[in-house]
């Protein structure tokens, strides 16, 4: 969020859904949107949606595999999500992607849903005089915050002409006893939590610097990004539209 914009309006960083909606409304002006949310029917939009669904005790299936998407809790979560678009608190299109902190730095919006992939760029902007802050996703009043954890993987195709060389590269970068390269990848090339707990343990101080410390603090509230069939994601994508 743009800390200066919130301070000018006398708004504290939101902690609850109602505070988030109120802040988005107050921060929306003729020159700036209150918040950036993804608008297109994409996997990234669903990635942003899952925590809001979970925080209202909604889900696609229950533990026994029964469909629960039609329950009231899902409707309540959708009713919260929809007005941000309907009331034009967020833009209907973006020059920068919804995953880019440029939307805050360039004054497109005062708040944005984002993740660890924004940290390095946000801290560079702050060095240049911006005042970008971060807080956990707001949650319904009286309920615990939840976020979503995604990730990226490298794999080698069995059809590759250089299977052994490609596999050697992956292990050199991410699986070696020398953790120099995986540490640089996770903290300099981008910011992400490595799958290897040993890498985190060896670099505790790096994960407690600046904005990283805030993400590390609520790391345990993350749930893995769910993997559903294309039929399910297509229906959910249409529902959000």
What is the role of each PLM region?
Residues 117-129, 140-238:
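C-terminal lobe and pocket-closing loops
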Residues 5-6, 25-26, 98-112, 238:
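Short helices/loops that flank or line small-molecule/ion binding pockets
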Residues 23-28, 64-94, 137:
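Glycine-centered hinge/linker elements that transmit conformational signals in sensory
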Residues 110-115, 133:
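Paired acidic/hydrophobic, glycine-rich loop segments that form the ligand-binding mouth/hinge
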Residues 8-13, 63-66, 82-96, 108, ...:
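A local structural motif
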């Amino acid at each position: 969020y743009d800390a200066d914009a919130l301070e000018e309006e006398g708004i504290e960083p939101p902690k609850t859904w109602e505070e988030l909606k109120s802040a988005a409304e107050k921060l929306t002006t003729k020159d700036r949107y209150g918040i950036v949310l993804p608008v297109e029917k994409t996997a990234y939009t669903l990635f942003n949606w899952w925590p809001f669904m979970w925080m209202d005790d909604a889900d696609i299936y229950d533990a026994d595999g029964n469909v629960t998407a039609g329950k009231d809790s899902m409707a309540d979560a959708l009713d919260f999500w929809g007005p941000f678009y309907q009331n034009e608190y967020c833009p209907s299109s973006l020059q920068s992607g919804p995953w880019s902190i440029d939307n805050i730095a360039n004054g497109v919006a005062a708040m944005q849903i984002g993740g660890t992939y924004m940290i390095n760029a946000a801290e560079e902007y702050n060095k240049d005089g911006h005042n970008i802050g971060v807080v956990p996703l707001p949650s319904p009043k009286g309920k615990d915050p939840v976020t979503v954890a995604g990730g990226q993987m490298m794999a080698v195709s069995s059809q590759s002409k250089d299977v052994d060389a490609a596999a050697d590269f992956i292990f050199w970068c991410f699986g070696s006893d020398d953790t120099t390269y995986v540490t640089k990848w996770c903290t300099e090339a981008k910011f992400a939590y490595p799958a290897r707990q040993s890498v985190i343990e060896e670099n505790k101080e790096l994960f407690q610097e600046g904005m990283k410390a805030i993400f590390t603090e609520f790391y345990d509230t993350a749930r893995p990004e769910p993997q559903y069939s294309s039929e399910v994601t297509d229906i959910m994508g249409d529902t959000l539209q």
